Amino acid sequence: MSNVDGLVEDGWERVADTFRANFKDGKDLGAACCVYVDGRAVVDLWGGLADRETNRPWERDTVALVASTTKGATAMCAHLLVQRGLLDLDAPVARYWPEFGAEGKEKLPVRYLLSHQAGLPVVDTPVTFEEACAWDPLVRALEAQKPLWTPGTEHLYHAMTYGFLVGEVIRRITGRSLGTFFAEEIARPLGLSAWIGLPEEIEPRVARIEAAPFPYKSMEDLVTDFAKLMGFDPAVAGTLVKDVYGPGSTFMKAGAVGGITEENMHSRAYRAAEFPAANMFTNAHSLARMYAATVSDVDGFRLLQPDTVAAMTVVQTDRTRMHGVPPVLLPYTKNLFRMSLGFWRATPPINPLLGPASFGHPGSGGSLGAADPESRVGFGYVPNLWAATLVDPRAIELTAAVRKCLG
């Protein structure tokens, strides 16, 4: 069994037991988990291997790629500007970014960028990986792109374009890149080990990502498991998996925008560039601390005020259909994607988070950052063994343990 180090305060042993069980059961290779309550860490654990090939242990300061968990940090940057009166979510994007108004987008409001309702999950203009790393070519492609649907009438996860859309608005307002703004306004004031655009000197601290073996004998087994989790008829689940997650779907194409592949995701070029939807490197302590600062003071620093949090966590997608899903299946998609202004909201049983009022963002591979305003909790989980399932049980089990400890 892997060694687990760190802090566990009295009353929080259930979280520690759940974390240790992930190693015992082979669910984790290396990982970290942290819980803040009222601005103070009550659980701060790490263990296992940061790199199996070299037998390097996961240390307190180890960081890892957290994929789409990055989107929560990017959303916080936007809401910090809203809080300062510098960004109006109901204003057209073109007010801040005039070139965006082409192809019928002149009235598209900023809020649709944050809620994945803009109709821009993909671009028609081919953009190479090298061009995406340079930023401007993908921004130009978004300016020239016509929305796939009338903005605000449908939604679909903007897997990669989200970061360029929100990041360019922030750049136009502040004159700083998203990664620089995040570093100066969030990471440094809170003392986080978190970067969107990884400095080369941090490379020795980065955990090596491994893909977990596919746990199913066939796609039919995956569908059966998904149906059981969601309470769906297997036929319904099979159609959803095919239409939403199948090869050639817009959802799958959205994840490949900018020439992103499994190979170049682990390159120095990708780590050094800014992909504000997908390439933050951080650890669980920093995720929990960052989210804690949205619901409480952390060492005298409060990132977002209660009225800002209340406004940014209103669900935006409940009244719109998921793009590409047949109408007969729409009732089944409501709990697949409940998005507020940049954050997932709790969607039991697939993503219960910390409770009904909680918000956060998961990432491919299993990472999660979340907060709960009612219990004033910040939560972070970061693994380096990336699960190959539609729903990762590790964060679900850890957040369930947090809820139990809260009573």
Predicted features and spans:
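Active-site helix/loop module of the DD-peptidase/beta-lactamase fold
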Residues: 60, 65-69, 83-125, 143-144, ...
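Active-site-proximal alpha-helical segments within enzyme catalytic domains
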Residues: 116, 162-169, 274, 278-300, ...
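Flexible glycine/proline-enriched surface loops and loop-helix/loop-strand junctions
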Residues: 59, 145-152, 162-165, 267-276
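Structured C-terminal helix/loop/strand segments within mature extracytoplasmic catalytic/sensor domains
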Residues: 361-407
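Active-site SXXK
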Residues: 16-20, 39, 63-90, 166-171, ...
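Short, conserved catalytic-motif segment at the N-terminal edge
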Residues: 5-66, 88, 144
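Short, gly/Ser/Thr-rich active-site loops of penicillin-recognizing serine hydrolases
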Residues: 296-299, 308, 313-328, 388-407
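Active-site Gly/Thr loop motif
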Residues: 212-284, 314-374
